[in-house]
Structure formats: structure tokens, C-alpha cells
């Protein structure tokens, strides 16, 4: 299936000079959404994943169906202050400033095989921070999966030690 046909290009969003890749049309098309979910599921199954992790918010959209399909848990990675129990937090640099992500301390058990799923691989900063959270808790990151990869931003280089799967490249 040509998943690119289900991605809308929106010029000058969220600011002038940006070409935003809108995944909403894919999510609205049941067959395309199922196809993407099935591709992620097969990747996670091939990695023998015990747990799926997804950064907020769109990592939830693609990660949860995979966890359900495999009968494994899903652990959400959130912005600080959004998780109600004890959590670990990692800060990372952005082009202009920094950001932080958190994960419940009991979300990942030592030795668990984890696949992390998100919608977009751009610079790789969010995914690198998510990997760091999982590994801090003793998880083994066996794969990273993305709906879209923006090749020019070279985020894959930051993640070179991991098996990366993308469904759409721009």
C-alpha cells in the first residue's frame, strides 16, 4: 500500500517555511491505518518485543494498537508532571532550548525487550531521550519504528546503534 498517498503536505505550518506532514488522513482511512499498524506489529513481533513504548502524543496512536495486537503492555512516555507516580526523567537539547521526557519507574522491567514506536523521525532527539529512559530502567531496546522519516534531518545517525524501521521516507 502507498502510505504516502495518505499523508497531507501542509505548507507554512506550524510556522512559515515549514512543510508539515499531516498524518490525520492516514488515521481517518481504516485500511491505511490498519496497514501501518500491521507493519509495526510484524516488526515488533520479529524483535520478540515484551513491551511497546511510545512518546506522547502520536507515539500513543501507533504504539497502542501494536501492544494490543501482540498481547503485551504499552508504556507511555510523557512530558514532566504528567505521570502521577514515581518516574524517571531525561532532558535533551532542542535547536532552540531543551525539553524533558518522563517514564514511570515501574514501566520497564530489567531485561524486557522493548520496541519504541513514534510517528516521525526528524532530528532523533526525542527518540534518543526515550531510548535513554528505557535503558535507565534496564530495558533492552530491540527496535525503533516510525511512520515517517525526514531523511534530510539525519535523525537516523543519532540512532545508529539501533534497528530502525520507517514506513515512509521524505
Curated annotation (Swiss-Prot):
Pathway: Purine metabolism; AMP biosynthesis via salvage pathway; AMP from adenine: step 1/1. InterPro entries: Ade_phspho_trans, PRibTrfase_dom, PRTase-like, UPRTase/APRTase. Its EC number is 2.4.2.7. This is Adenine phosphoribosyltransferase. One of its GO terms (molecular function) is AMP binding. The lineage of its organism: Bacteria, Bacillati, Mycoplasmatota, Mollicutes, Acholeplasmatales. It catalyses: AMP + diphosphate = 5-phospho-alpha-D-ribose 1-diphosphate + adenine. It comes from Acholeplasma laidlawii (strain PG-8A). The gene is apt. One of its GO terms (biological process) is adenine salvage.
Amino acid at each position: 500500500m502507498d502510505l504516502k498517498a495518505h499523508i497531507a503536505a501542509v505548507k507554512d505550518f506550524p510556522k512559515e517555511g515549514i512543510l508539515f506532514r499531516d498524518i490525520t488522513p492516514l488515521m481517518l482511512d481504516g485500511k491505511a491505518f490498519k496497514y501501518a499498524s500491521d507493519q509495526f506489529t510484524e516488526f515488533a513481533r520479529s524483535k520478540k518485543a515484551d513491551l511497546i513504548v511510545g512518546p506522547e502524543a502520536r507515539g500513543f496512536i501507533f504504539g497502542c494498537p501494536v501492544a494490543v495486537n501482540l498481547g503485551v503492555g504499552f508504556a507511555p512516555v510523557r512530558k514532566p508532571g504528567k505521570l502521577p507516580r514515581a518516574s524517571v526523567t531525561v532532558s535533551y537539547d532542542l535547536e532552540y532550548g531543551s525539553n524533558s521526557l518522563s517514564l514511570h519507574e515501574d514501566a520497564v522491567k530489567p531485561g524486557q525487550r522493548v520496541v519504541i514506536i513514534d510517528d516521525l523521525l526528524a532530528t532523533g532527539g526525542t527518540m534518543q531521550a526515550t531510548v535513554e529512559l528505557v535503558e535507565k530502567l534496564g530495558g533492552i531496546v530491540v527496535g525503533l519504528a516510525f511512520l515517517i522519516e525526514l531523511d534530510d534531518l539525519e535523525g537516523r545517525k543519532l540512532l545508529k546503534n539501533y534497528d530502525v524501521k520507517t514506513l515512509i521516507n521524505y
